[in-house]
Amino acid sequence: VDGLRNALADVVGHRFVVTDADVLTTRSTDQTGRYTGRACALVRPADTAEIAALLNVCRSRGVPVTVQGGRTGLVAGTVPEHDDVLLSTERLAAIGDVDLAAGRITAGAGVTLAQVHSAAAAAGLKFGVDIASRDTATIGGMVSTNAGGLHTVRYGNMAEQVLGLEVVLPDGTTVRRSPKVLSDNSGYNLPALWVGSEGTLGVVTSVDLKLRKIPTYRVTSLIGFDTLQDVVEAGRVLRTLDGVDALELLDGRGLELAARHLKAAVPTGRPWYLLAEVSAAHDPLEDLAELLERIGPPQTPAVAVDAPGSTRLWAARECFAEVVGLFGPPLKFDAALPLDSLATFTEDATAVIASRAPEAIPILFGHVAEGNIHLNVLNCPNADTVYRSVLELVRDHGGNVSSEHGVGSLKRNYLDLALSAQDIATMWAIKRALDPSDYLNRAVMFPDALRH
């Protein structure tokens, strides 16, 4: 261990190598608190060259490496399992100037999402992806998981925002792909290879991101419904609006908990809610009102046309994860279902949970336009049984088991519920080509059967 520590310190300096047991335990536990691994050291490199050197040190010694960003993931994607070296990207925090003409900005892997939003706003632009953990989630991790979030219906996932990137491959080679023109058909779209690869194919060190114009007007509405199918149908109608920014599904019980937690005056009392936001160069209030009248919700919607009102409504949505966490670490699902199957899946999943764990409480929220749901099960003692049963239901209803959180280590042995054997074999062939010793993010994505 001392030899490894000294070799790591030769690269980054002794102050940036940590072997304290308490620190390593904290850094080896994921955000949910459900999953803890084991690591032998934490290193915090300053730049791409140091990352390349660190990877060479670890690879040559046969030491696994787990890459960590903001550690906001929910599928144990940064939890080490093999006494790994933890490689943190937190010091890769440089952020470039906004290129107004091209609508782009370059951010280091350790830059937080909030910092990108701030830099874009200062230049009169915006970044299209947003998530509740924006203050701690980092760009490198968001690219590696192809994060989505609150505005995917309009702007897409991280894949749609990446114009170029720099990555250190498992062999220490650095690849920089940063075309300055939008029309570029010269060879493979290499950046796409690392978007969503969850650190298994290399360490993303910086990213060129697309920025957008800020719409002049914004209207936010919280609408109550009696059934989930009503929410789905309302989402279909509202999605036809020009400039729809968000269509968020909220479980009525969760909204009540959020309202109490925030001590906020938001509508409650209905089983289901839809948080809709529209922004455009023209005032969309009249268009939204017309569609709401056509939908005919059972109670008058709350509508906000100013920033404070919008912030109040969004606060209730954004604290959902925090609120459900107050009852202990929930069992979390992140799945996408065809819209036609969303309501029936929810009914079936609720029944399965009730039969496997009668004392458990399911709370649902998500992004209804994409059929992306976050099912949180509170007080669930039979977690393993419930987990597989619900994921099998996802498959049976035509969905996928990982919509935006990634596979991580939590879902690696359920990958066959979403992908064919040939899909997995092709991905594994790419992994083996770039990382033949399988030392980088070894616990992530691929089923145990491939590794034994």
Residues of each region from the PLM?
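Noncatalytic alpha-helical scaffold of FAD-dependent oxidoreductases
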Residues: V1-H452
